[in-house]
Amino acid sequence: MSLHRVTVVRVVVPVIIAASGAVALAQAAPASVAASAAAGSAGSSSAAKAKPVYFHTLPPGAKLPSGATCARLVNATPEGEVKAANRPYNRRKGQSVGRHFFSAGDSPLAQKRIAPLITGDFTGTTIDILRWAACKWGIDQDMVFAQAAVESWWQQDTLGDWGTDAAACPPGHKLGQDGKPGECPQSYGILQNRYPYEDGGWPAMINSTAMNADAAYGIWRACFDGYETWLNTVPRGAQYHAGDAWGCVGRWFAGRWRTPAALGYIAKVKQYLREKIWLKPYFRQLG
């Protein structure tokens, strides 16, 4: 769930249990690593044997790889689908988020440097879409896997943050239309992007898994690079600053910086990371 200035109680369908673990910050493997791995030895099926590149967190202000570069790295060692219901959403690309995606309380650099890169321009399996987003925005891929499990169990059709405010309902999702009389969901998709704060990404946020993940981690990067200065103008548990990867994970849920709600969410994501919940047999939904 993406919150810019408001803390709300979230209700997510389906209900998810907690979260992940600590991840070291490191430089992502260069394209040459994937290229040499994919090349392999002559006459062999190298793509099947190549070890996938692991995408690590890149420091604030780092030069990030392009979406096209990340697509090549991911597609060099593609991984299978574990969420069959996502296939229609995984086949759809995203859209531009427009000129006013980030709030006026953010540094103008967020809109200038981050927003134009949010496009959802990728298709693939669910895990490959998450790998692509991790690569593109320079965040440790296991953090992404764990957070997406907390938010939606990796299910793009997840609906959350139900409310009664008709103005907060996206087009096509009027009050009562999605199964709860007098309510509509405000958060959608694999990362539970929230319509009132990210309306520039609609309707692709709902229809495209790649768009949902791309926007979520574009916002994470804006936070990590120090652009979300409004976090120091609202109640907080500490002073917001650049470079706190986990603080920016907690901000996604709580809309505040290292408050009790944010810390509780961070603990959930870290639990799933420790467990590597996405590798468990019961996590797979193949049909």
Features from the language model and the residues they span:
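A sequence-level detector of short, solvent-exposed, charge-rich linear segments
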Residues: Q27, A31, G163-A167, R284
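Short, functionally critical alpha-helical segments immediately adjacent to catalytic or ligand/cofactor-binding
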Residues: I129-R131, K136-L175, N193, A216, ...
